[in-house]
C-alpha cells in the first residue's frame, strides 16, 4: 500500500493521518499527527480463537521519553513499566473500543500506541484514541467502529474542546468523552463541584465534537480500508441450549432471586454443578466432550444473564429485592483504628471499604517525571482489592490496571475539596482497603475517604459521596438502577459512577457494554445519582457533622516561616550541612520551597519551636533602632566588635561606648563581655554600627561646680576637629627676657 496522507483541522489544530508508510505488517497501522504530537498506532489480531470465556483485548499506551526530549529516569536510563498516567490512558482507550467487537469474538487483539513526539498543547492521548479506532477500522479486524474521543474543559462559563495546557489549568472541568456517531459510550471526569446541567451540556457538546472526528475517520476508511476477515465466533449448540433451558431454567430462576449474595451464589452454583454433572456423565466418551462442556457452561451463564435482566425489566424486581432507585443499607464509622492519622469505615450492603489517612511533610510528595515537565504530587489515593473481599483465592502482588484506575477515580473525586497548600501544608495519602465487595467498591472507597479526612482534621471544603448507577436496556425500554451490586454490574449494560458534594459533581466515570447511551438516559441517571448522593451524605454527616478542629495526636505538627529567597542557601548550608545539623539537633523534618516557605514538622511542639528559633536566627537581619544583648568578640583601638546574633556582628566605636571620654577600649569592655547595644546605622554594604551609650542616660552638662561657681575647665568648641586647648605658661617666654 502506497503512503497516503489525510488532513483536517480540529479544535484549532492540524490533524494529519498517514497510512501505508510504517508498520505495514500489522493488520492496520496509522501515524496520527495532532499539532506537534505524533502517535504511531498498530493493531494486530491472532489467527485463531483464544481459549477462555472472555475477549482478550490488550491496549497499550507507550510513552517514549525521547518524544519530549528527555532521558528516562533511574539507573538504567531506559523506559520500564508504564507510568500511572500511561496505564490510565490505556484504560481510557480500551473502554470505548471494547464494546465495538461482536459478542462471541475470541481472537486476541492488541492495539499498541507509541508516542513518538509530544506537544503539551495538543493531546497525545486523544490522538492515540483516534489512531486506535482508525487502525482497527482500516484493518481486516472485525471492528464495528469507528469511535473517537475528545477532552472537554469549562473556562469562564464556556465549554472548550481539547483545551490547551494553559486553559486546562484554569478549567473547572477535566472531562474525556468518547462514543460512536450515534451515542456516548465512555466518560471519565474530574470537576470542581459542577452542576448536573453543566456536566450534561459538556457531555453533549463533547459528543458533537466526537461526530466530527468520526466523519473524518469514515472518509479515510472509505479510501484505504481493508475487507474484514471472516472469523469464528463463539456460539453454543442450539439443541443443547433448548434442552437445558427446558429442564433447569425454573431452578435457576429461584436461585437468582435469593436476596443475600453468598447464599445466592451458593444456590446458583448448586444448579450449575447439578447440570454439569449430568452432562459430564452423558457425554463422557464423546469425541467433542470439551466443546460440549464449554457450551454447557456458556448456556448456564446466558440463562442467569437473561433471568437477572428479565426480573428487572419486566417484574421491576432486583435480585436482592430492592426497588430500582433504592440504596442498600448504609453504615459509617470513624476512628476505626488507633494510632493512625485518621480512619473511616464505610459499608453499603455487602460492600465495605476502610480508608486510612496519613499526613506527612511536603518532602514526601510524589515526583512525577513523565512527558510533561516534572512536578510534585501532593495528594495520593490508593485502592487495594484483596481477593478475600469476594471470598476467593487469587493473585497478590503489584496493583493491576483496575486498582490503579479505581484509585485515580477516588483521587479525582476527593482532590476537588482538599484545602490549598497554604491552608494545609501537608502531603496527604489515603489508602482504601476493600474488605468486602458486592459492587460499587470504588464509590465506597470515596465515602470512606471522606470519613477519614474529616476524622483526621483535614479541612476539606465539603464531604464527598459516590454512587454507582446501572442500566438494563432491552430494545426501546430501559431501566436505570441506583447503587448496583455485583450481579447487576456483571449482567447489566452500564456502570456509571457519580461522586460529588451537595453543591455539585466532582468525578464521573462511565463504562458500557452496549454501543452507546442517549442524552435521555444520561439525564435520568444523573438525576437519580444526585438523590442517592444526598442520602449517603446524610449518613456521613450524621456520623461526623464537621471536620475535627485538630489533627490526631500522632500526626506530625507543623509550623511555617517565610524567609527571603536569598537566605535559603544560608539555612541549607554548604552541601546541606546547616539544615542537617538543625534536623539532627531537634529531630524535626524541614521542607523549603523555591519561594522561601519553610515548613517544620514534628510530633513534638517543643522541637518545632527550637528549630524555628534556630532558623529565624540564621536569617535574622539587624534593624536600625533595635536593641540587642551582644557579646564582645574582638577589640581594636578604635572600638569593639560585638556579635548581635549568629553570624551578624556590629562595630561599637570607642566614641559610642560611654558618655565620658575614654582613651582605651579595654577600660570599658573585654572579650567575652555581654553588653546591651542599639543599632544606629547600617550602610549600603550591610556594615552595622551600634552604640552602648545610646542606652545610657545622658549626664547633665557640667556648667557649675558644687559651690555654684562657674567651672574654669575650658570648653571644647563643637564641630572643630583640630581644636587644641590653649597652653598655660608658668614660665616667662624667652622673648621677654
UniProtKB/Swiss-Prot annotation:
What EC number(s) does this enzyme carry? 2.7.7.8
State the organism of origin.
Streptococcus pneumoniae (strain ATCC BAA-255 / R6)
Q: Which cofactor does it need?
A: Mg(2+)
Where are the compositionally biased (Basic and acidic residues) regions? Answer: 700-737
Q: Do the record's keywords include RNA-binding?
A: yes
Record-linked CDD domains: KH-I_PNPase (cd02393), RNase_PH_PNPase_1 (cd11363), RNase_PH_PNPase_2 (cd11364)
Keyword list (alphabetical) reads: Cytoplasm, Magnesium, Metal-binding, Nucleotidyltransferase, RNA-binding, Transferase
The top EC class, named as a word, is transferase
The protein's name in its UniProt record: Polyribonucleotide nucleotidyltransferase
Amino acid at each position: 500500500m502506497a503512503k497516503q496522507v489525510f488532513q483536517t483541522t480540529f479544535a484549532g489544530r492540524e490533524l494529519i493521518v498517514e497510512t501505508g508508510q510504517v508498520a505495514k505488517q500489522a493488520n492496520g497501522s496509522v501515524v496520527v499527527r495532532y499539532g506537534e504530537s505524533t502517535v504511531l498506532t498498530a493493531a494486530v489480531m491472532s489467527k485463531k480463537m483464544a481459549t477462555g470465556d472472555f475477549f482478550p483485548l490488550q491496549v497499550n499506551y507507550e510513552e517514549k521519553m525521547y518524544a519530549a526530549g528527555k532521558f528516562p529516569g533511574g539507573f538504567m536510563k531506559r523506559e520500564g513499566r508504564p507510568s500511572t498516567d500511561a496505564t490510565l490512558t490505556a484504560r481510557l482507550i480500551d473502554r470505548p473500543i471494547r464494546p465495538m467487537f461482536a459478542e462471541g469474538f475470541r481472537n486476541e487483539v492488541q492495539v499498541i500506541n507509541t508516542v513518538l513526539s509530544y506537544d503539551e498543547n495538543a493531546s497525545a492521548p486523544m490522538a492515540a484514541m483516534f489512531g486506535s479506532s482508525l487502525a482497527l477500522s482500516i484493518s481486516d479486524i472485525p471492528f464495528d467502529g469507528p469511535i473517537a474521543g475528545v477532552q472537554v474543559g469549562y473556562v469562564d462559563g464556556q465549554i472548550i474542546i481539547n483545551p490547551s495546557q494553559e486553559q486546562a489549568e484554569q478549567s473547572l472541568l477535566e472531562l474525556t468523552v468518547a462514543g460512536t456517531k450515534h451515542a456516548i459510550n465512555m466518560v471519565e471526569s474530574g470537576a470542581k463541584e459542577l452542576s448536573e446541567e453543566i456536566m450534561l451540556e459538556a457531555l453533549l457538546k463533547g459528543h458533537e465534537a466526537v461526530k466530527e472526528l468520526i466523519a473524518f475517520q469514515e472518509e479515510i476508511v472509505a479510501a484505504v480500508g481493508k475487507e474484514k476477515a471472516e472469523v469464528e465466533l463463539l456460539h453454543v449448540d442450539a439443541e443443547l441450549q433448548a434442552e437445558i433451558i427446558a429442564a433447569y431454567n425454573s431452578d435457576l430462576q429461584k436461585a437468582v432471586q435469593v436476596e443475600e449474595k453468598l447464599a445466592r451464589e451458593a444456590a446458583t452454583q448448586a444448579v450449575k454443578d447439578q447440570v454439569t454433572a449430568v452432562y459430564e456423565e452423558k457425554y463422557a466418551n464423546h469425541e467433542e466432550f470439551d466443546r460440549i462442556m464449554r457450551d454447557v457452561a456458556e448456556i448456564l451463564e446466558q440463562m442467569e444473564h437473561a433471568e437477572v435482566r428479565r426480573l428487572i425489566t419486566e417484574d421491576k424486581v432486583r435480585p436482592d429485592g430492592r426497588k430500582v432507585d433504592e440504596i442498600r443499607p448504609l453504615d459509617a464509622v470513624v476512628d476505626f483504628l488507633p494510632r493512625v492519622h485518621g480512619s473511616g469505615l464505610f459499608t453499603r450492603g455487602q460492600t465495605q471499604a476502610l480508608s486510612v489517612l496519613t499526613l506527612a511533610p511536603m518532602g514526601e510528595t510524589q515526583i512525577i517525571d513523565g512527558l510533561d515537565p516534572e512536578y510534585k504530587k501532593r495528594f495520593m489515593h490508593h485502592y487495594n482489592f484483596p481477593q478475600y473481599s469476594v471470598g476467593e483465592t487469587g493473585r497478590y502482588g503489584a496493583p493491576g490496571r483496575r486498582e490503579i484506575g479505581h484509585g485515580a477515580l477516588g483521587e479525582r473525586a476527593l482532590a476537588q475539596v482538599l484545602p490549598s497548600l497554604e491552608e494545609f501544608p501537608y502531603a496527604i495519602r489515603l489508602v482504601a482497603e476493600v474488605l468486602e465487595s458486592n459492587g460499587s467498591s470504588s464509590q465506597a472507597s470515596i465515602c470512606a475517604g471522606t470519613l477519614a479526612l474529616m476524622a483526621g482534621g483535614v479541612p476539606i471544603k465539603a464531604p464527598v459521596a459516590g454512587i454507582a448507577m446501572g442500566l438494563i436496556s432491552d430494545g426501546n425500554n430501559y431501566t436505570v438502577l441506583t447503587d448496583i451490586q455485583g450481579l447487576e454490574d456483571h449482567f447489566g449494560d452500564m456502570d456509571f459512577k457519580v461522586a460529588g458534594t451537595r453543591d455539585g459533581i466532582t468525578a464521573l466515570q462511565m463504562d458500557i457494554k452496549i454501543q452507546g447511551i442517549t442524552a435521555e438516559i444520561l439525564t435520568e441517571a444523573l438525576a437519580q445519582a444526585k438523590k442517592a448522593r444526598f442520602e449517603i451524605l446524610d449518613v456521613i454527616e450524621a456520623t461526623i457533622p464537621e471536620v475535627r478542629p485538630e489533627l490526631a495526636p500522632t500526626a506530625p505538627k507543623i509550623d511555617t516561616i517565610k524567609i527571603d529567597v536569598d537566605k535559603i542557601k544560608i539555612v541549607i548550608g554548604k552541601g546541606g550541612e546547616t539544615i542537617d545539623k538543625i534536623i539532627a539537633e531537634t529531630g524535626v523534618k524541614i521542607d523549603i520551597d523555591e519561594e522561601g516557605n519553610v515548613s517544620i514538622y514534628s510530633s513534638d511542639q517543643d522541637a518545632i519551636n527550637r528549630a524555628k528559633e534556630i532558623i529565624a536566627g540564621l536569617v535574622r537581619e539587624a534593624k536600625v533602632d533595635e536593641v540587642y544583648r551582644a557579646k564582645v568578640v574582638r577589640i581594636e583601638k578604635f572600638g569593639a566588635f560585638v556579635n548581635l546574633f549568629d553570624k551578624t556582628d556590629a562595630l561599637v566605636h570607642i566614641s559610642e561606648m560611654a558618655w565620658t571620654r575614654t582613651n582605651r577600649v579595654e577600660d570599658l569592655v573585654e572579650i567575652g563581655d555581654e553588653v546591651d547595644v542599639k543599632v544606629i546605622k547600617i550602610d549600603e554594604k550591610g556594615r552595622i554600627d551600634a552604640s552602648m551609650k545610646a542606652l545610657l542616660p545622658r549626664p547633665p552638662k557640667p556648667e557649675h561646680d558644687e559651690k555654684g561657681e562657674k567651672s574654669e575647665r575650658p570648653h571644647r568648641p563643637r564641630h572643630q576637629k583640630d581644636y587644641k586647648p590653649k597652653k598655660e605658661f608658668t614660665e616667662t617666654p624667652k622673648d621677654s627676657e
